[in-house]
């Protein structure tokens, strides 16, 4: 089974690339989506409130990701503490899904993980595709998609590895500075060359 790690900074276009791969029959594992589910785990919620206080809880008992994000992004030590709580469970969930796909005879899987390098998940993949985009495009996406101010966007960007840091692990670099149809054509070509498609 071929396992590709799709990584890159926030707003670079990882999800779009994965959507195109999914259209080609590649199974997608979204590490952020798993991370959101992990936050619903009662034990994890308790650990998070022990570290960050009850203000990160919604009245319904779930973690308020917006408040938690404001507490950790821009504060590397806090972010590291949060990641130490959540990353082991996220990795465990990804590994379980990969094993399930292996048993089903799935040929190709892409793991969408912005923190693939930082979290130490390179061991889970056969190769890394780095998605990059111009800074201004990223700021616009983060503002329109998440309502982040420029300062909030910068804090999130700075909490992740840089493209240069990720580059040393990348087998493929996809520069997302083009039209959607050009990006799609690029992904289709890469998938045909590097993945086993059904």
Swiss-Prot record:
Domain (DPCK): residue spans on this chain: 3-198
GO CC aspect terms: cytoplasm
Organism: Dehalococcoides mccartyi (strain CBDB1)
EC number: 2.7.1.24
Reactions catalysed, as given in the entry: 3'-dephospho-CoA + ATP = ADP + CoA + H(+)
Chief subcellular location: cytoplasm
Pathway in which this enzyme or protein is active: Cofactor biosynthesis; coenzyme A biosynthesis; CoA from (R)-pantothenate: step 5/5
Role played: Catalyzes the phosphorylation of the 3'-hydroxyl group of dephosphocoenzyme A to form coenzyme A.
Gene: coaE
Sequence positions that bind ATP: 11-16
A Pfam match: CoaE
Name of the molecule in the record: Dephospho-CoA kinase
Record's keyword terms, sorted: ATP-binding, Coenzyme A biosynthesis, Cytoplasm, Kinase, Nucleotide-binding, Transferase
């Amino acid at each position: 089974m071929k396992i590709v790690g799709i990584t890159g900074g926030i707003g670079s276009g990882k999800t779009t690339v994965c959507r195109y791969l999914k259209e080609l029959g590649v199974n997608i594992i979204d590490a952020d989506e798993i991370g959101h589910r992990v936050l619903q785990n009662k034990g994890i919620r308790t650990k998070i409130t022990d570290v960050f206080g009850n203000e990160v809880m919604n009245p319904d008992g779930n973690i308020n990701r917006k408040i938690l994000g404001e507490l950790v992004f821009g504060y590397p030590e806090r972010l590291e503490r949060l990641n130490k709580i959540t990353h082991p469970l996220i990795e465990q969930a990804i590994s379980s899904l990969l094993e399930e796909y292996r048993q089903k005879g799935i040929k190709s899987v892409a793991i969408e993980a912005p923190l693939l390098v930082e979290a130490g998940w390179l061991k889970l993949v056969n190769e890394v595709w780095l998605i990059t985009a111009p800074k201004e495009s990223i700021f616009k996406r983060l503002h329109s998609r998440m309502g982040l101010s420029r300062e909030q966007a910068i804090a999130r960007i700075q909490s992740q590895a840089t493209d240069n840091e990720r580059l040393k692990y990348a087998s493929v670099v996809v520069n997302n500075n083009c039209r959607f149809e050009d990006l799609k054509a690029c992904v289709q070509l890469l998938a045909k060359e590097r993945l086993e498609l059904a």
